[in-house]
């Protein structure tokens, strides 16, 4: 029962600020949550915001609550684990505590010092920006590799081979990610939240968005240049937004599907982890019925699949041609 909140010393809110169709943060979801719990809040309680929020959200929440009920501390402690690695990483990654005062920091320290040996003290705005900066940096990193992929394509060269050459025994290239679909519920959203905060002058992040989101359009153009798309059954392998996940939120696989469905004879989809899409088909059926296969999410289980000599588009450079005798585009 929500009324149980009044008996607790600490309340953790795991709701962030999504973005709307204009790429602006939406605060209404947090406000609705606060409005629901406000009647049950008591003096000296600590509220911890854990999810990604737009800059200065913690300040707004603190003022909003304390204008109605005094003596309630609000801190921002960003969750920074990689999806699928929470149990391992939550104890390894330093926990950031963004607090307005020492009293609030000390309260939060009591809980987070039990989770991790390392705690970093910050202001709420510093903590908010640290989370958004990290996600935006990663998003931009992916866009660089995707831009390299598109440049290689224009030059008629396989980026996978260039990628191997770049990284071969060269430490300064060790962190360059592969090309591939960069989407999901965090990186794109947080990059756009920074742009909104900075008066839409985050040109680097906005260009990264154009590259990452535009990769899908480039692939559809590539198909049209090499095939009569109207006669194609196209199979999409992996509909989750990332490898070895069942999360389809903001997945570029679905953006590609919608684009291809306009012109292709049929678009077939499969994913070993996704359970909520009724249109998914068994992997072998998709391979057998398709004239062209596109690797959208590089699930580990796909590493050994038999592609039966079908033409393949693999932006990730993940699949091997040694066993499949496929033509890669």
Annotate each predicted stretch with a short phrase.
Residues 1-329:
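Structural/interface elements that position substrates and couple domains in central-metabolism enzymes
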